[in-house]
Amino acid sequence: MFFACYCALRTNVKKYRYQDEDAPHDHSLPRLTHEVRGPELVHVSEKNLSQIENVHGYVLQSHISPLKASPAPIIVNTDTLDTIPYVNGTEIEYEFEEITLERGNSGLGFSIAGGTDNPHIGDDPGIFITKIIPGGAAAEDGRLRVNDCILRVNEVDVSEVSHSKAVEALKEAGSIVRLYVRRRRPILETVVEIKLFKGPKGLGFSIAGGVGNQHIPGDNSIYVTKIIDGGAAQKDGRLQVGDRLLMVNNYSLEEVTHEEAVAILKNTSEVVYLKVGKPTTIYMTDPYGPPDITHSYSPPMENHLLSGNNGTLEYKTSLPPISPGRYSPIPKHMLVDDDYTRPPEPVYSTVNKLCDKPASPRHYSPVECDKSFLLSAPYSHYHLGLLPDSEMTSHSQHSTATRQPSMTLQRAVSLEGEPRKVVLHKGSTGLGFNIVGGEDGEGIFVSFILAGGPADLSGELQRGDQILSVNGIDLRGASHEQAAAALKGAGQTVTIIAQYQPEDYARFEAKIHDLREQMMNHSMSSGSGSLRTNQKRSLYVRAMFDYDKSKDSGLPSQGLSFKYGDILHVINASDDEWWQARRVMLEGDSEEMGVIPSKRRVERKERARLKTVKFNAKPGVIDSKGSFNDKRKKSFIFSRKFPFYKNKEQSEQETSDPERGQEDLILSYEPVTRQEINYTRPVIILGPMKDRINDDLISEFPDKFGSCVPHTTRPKRDYEVDGRDYHFVISREQMEKDIQEHKFIEAGQYNDNLYGTSVQSVRFVAERGKHCILDVSGNAIKRLQVAQLYPIAIFIKPRSLEPLMEMNKRLTEEQAKKTYDRAIKLEQEFGEYFTAIVQGDTLEDIYNQCKLVIEEQSGPFIWIPSKEKL
């Protein structure tokens, strides 16, 4: 039969091993890693501000809660700096202002970040305004702006102090607070006209703003928020993120709604005339501009409970409001519905419109956010709601009617020391809060309130509350596990006795902080430097396994199912157990967001499963389910044109020692980055029925699929043509040298002649617009990746023996069993390199799935492995 006839050839064959075959796979590709640490937000009341600041020595951003403004007159100080900084040869001009605010019961109404111990922008040690709280003293006064730098608080110089010193200066400034601030001078606008030709990908940009949907508070203009790769705007090159759209053809976009602007743009013809307003100067290397978030930087975001158009409640995440003279990052969720093309993935922008209007926010309400700094500590968490810092939205528009959270800071303070009864009704997100504690009898504390969850909507719980009892079960001395079990098993209606204990909670935080510091010191002293922080991370990964949320009983809230090969946008990877993510579709991020198991959780559970499997398995029996962690020594697998086999001795050695060469690697998620390619991707199909699939693709689509010409040292026969049948190599030594230099993706020897498929042969086909069908082993996948010819690698995974025998009726049951086992081993060996795994009960079903995968993965934008660490 098919396989048996080649077994007789084994003794005549020897294999060329590449030097890197036995080395661990590190995807030796040219990749960049961008790990830019972004600021974090802590929302606290004025009363316990100093306590939490003492605990959070590493906090990057603090909240000064809102109150009323003073009627103090405006005092403008026009002093200038002694030395004017230069950027790209241009002077950066600043203006200075002294602003007097009257503090009320809750604070000054703005947030700050920065300091000498944790600079907010570049290496600048200044204290910067990061948010103006609506309704607060600063907002009502109207002069303080986001990105203003505070130089002095009353008579205290804070131009070069630590973050905690600045907070202390603000806290102790008294009821009348004089702020001396520095800001960039507003940049004027230049009007230009741009002519665009739509083309197949449309105009290629996204917009935000409009009447009732202001992108910049107080400004009804329509702004460009994204330039899409391959679209008309990108090809033209003049339209930029941050440009203000003034006119489309003969239609003015001044004082129009968001919907009207969208309709005007969508109803244009092939030629579109735009009139746009541009900043006169953009400092491309401005040290005071925020870091590039195109890669892994995550700006501080806050959850807002919004009222949707259909009357239902939804969540929306907003960035700190944009100030004049500043660049502002634009989050993807603001760009979903109004793209005029189908972008393959969300692209984040860092340049925004610069205007001279005050930037105090008017349409956003703060929601208390847990910094989740405990997530990396050696204390377990029980998540009753979604993880903090979520991005949840179902509309691209930026503003709808906001709903004030019912829990106010003033009320939180008044609840201190009073045990109180809280009745909650579980919703789709559980109870909507997280707990920590339960070690050494320290108590169970609320560490996070999910915006819009039952706890938040009730307004009766807050961060720092100690849970005394749940449905009559005393939790004052309970362990974390006991508290989690009590909450999880409490039914739909849960009665909680809680007591606000800020001092106890602060001591608990301090304890965790000390433990983290000890862990950090130990990690650094041991040289590992691998201690992971709790900072919110955003990245893209490729799933290396199937996940069904309905089968995971441990989900803390709404889960997200996915398949092997799916690209996931991980919005928050700060938690050790659960990540927040969306699937990345062809048109961008999916609206559906949920939690997925973290890399750590996946690997831990799989190792536990494998231990059980090995414990229960009989000696010498291989798990037929084929767990995805098995990794064996790489070997050449049969190719119809090149039968590259191991020699008999090698085969017997590996058969007798099945665990030899196995690496303890569990496939969970692979970090990826998006890349544009200018070639047609090669196609490698592995698994049963691959030959028939390959033949059908070339037969049905000869204009889209082809094969490359292999090399050989075998003498040319009379009927053969050099360059058509083979590239006939005269010098065996030269071909051996080329093999050693990795110029071949696969090579071997048969009857004393060398055969091989060269990278150049594959590239020749790929650059001529055809998918090169390759009948090679899984080893070739990585070698093509190294050559930056990223193949579409599809693995056909049989469901069971029956479909195999049905699709190939010549197979006996024994042969089908061997084919099935070979497929499982193939997945174990090369699973990390597959683009997709397909399954089907019929050949037609498998063929159609393969065609769909190839169509979706053809490019020009593809996801490739990156070196970012998980």
UniProtKB/Swiss-Prot annotation:
Gene3D superfamilies recorded: 2.30.42.10, Guanylate Kinase phosphate binding domain, P-loop containing nucleotide triphosphate hydrolases, SH3 Domains
Alphabetized CDD domains for the sequence: GMPK (cd00071), PDZ1_Dlg1-2-4-like (cd06723), PDZ2_Dlg1-2-4-like (cd06724), PDZ3_Dlg1-2-4-like (cd06795), SH3_DLG2 (cd12032)
Keyword hit for Disulfide bond: no
Location(s) in or outside the cell: Cell membrane; Postsynaptic density; Synapse; Membrane
Lipidation, S-palmitoyl cysteine type: C5, C7
Chain positions with Phosphotyrosine modification: Y58, Y505, Y750, Y755
Pfam families: Guanylate_kin, MAGUK_N_PEST, PDZ, PDZ_assoc, SH3_1
GO cellular component: adherens junction; axon cytoplasm; basolateral plasma membrane; cytosol; juxtaparanode region of axon; membrane; neuromuscular junction; neuron projection
Domain (SH3): residue spans on this chain: 536-606
Gene Ontology biological process terms, A to Z: anterograde axonal protein transport; cell-cell adhesion; cellular response to potassium ion; chemical synaptic transmission; establishment or maintenance of epithelial cell apical/basal polarity; nervous system development; protein localization to synapse; receptor clustering
Post-translational modification: Palmitoylation of isoform 1 is not required for targeting to postsynaptic density.
Protein name, per record: Disks large homolog 2
Organism: Homo sapiens (Human)
